[in-house]
Amino acid sequence: MRTKTIGLIAHTEKAGVAELTRAVVREFEQRSVEVLIENEIAELADEKAAGSPEEIFRRAELIVVLGGDGTILNVVAHAGENLKPIFGINVGF
């Protein structure tokens, strides 16, 4: 089964996260995957926003998290009953 929609959530204070966000978005879009970007990171990366983390949890099939361990754990804690598979990309120490 192919994933058609992913959510993208990131720690906005990590160095280089805006550039990494744009690169991740391009990679998924080239593969015809819709990317739902959380409002705050979308603004930082100059990308189209999809909504709050809660909205992204509801709509996405997979959540991609850009950040450290704390960011990933925070996403899991806030997903509630809408928890989806999470793919973490560690961008810090």
State where each predicted segment sits:
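Small-residue-rich beta-alpha loop regions that form the catalytic core of phosphotransfer
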Residues: 16, 42-43, 48-93
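Anion (oxyanion) recognition and catalysis
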Residues: 25, 29, 80
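Glycine- and acidic-residue-enriched helix-capping/strand-helix junction motifs
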Residues: 14-22
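Generic N-terminal amphipathic, Lys/Arg-enriched alpha-helix
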Residues: 1-13
